[in-house]
């Protein structure tokens, strides 16, 4: 039983990481899809109750926001893995600008998320933490979070 919590600004590649690494094995929990916290909580609860692996694909910039997934997952004896999906600020803004209108975030919103983003820590309750960046070859560079310095911010 495993819960994966993705963290990162809009346009950093969280959904792409989900598709590339977890699509065939984990349910995707995303406010982009579910639209309300009640629906999101119901889906998380269903995953926990049935032992279904899941990935939370939201920005999750702060420990308080991550806690809503970590605490119930830990209580259900799930292994909790975090991924900080980072990207250069200019690249995040460029990717966001290329999104369809319904998925585009105002640049001020993206900058606001970047300013609120606090790197996750094991003390929050994660069993593992990984740092993911998109590689130039289209794949992913994934390494332990504790060994990677922060990328330049917004």
Feature names for model-found ranges:
Residues 1-7, 12, 91-154:
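Conserved GTP-binding G-domain of TRAFAC-class P-loop NTPases and closely related GTPase folds
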Residues 15:
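Walker A/P-loop
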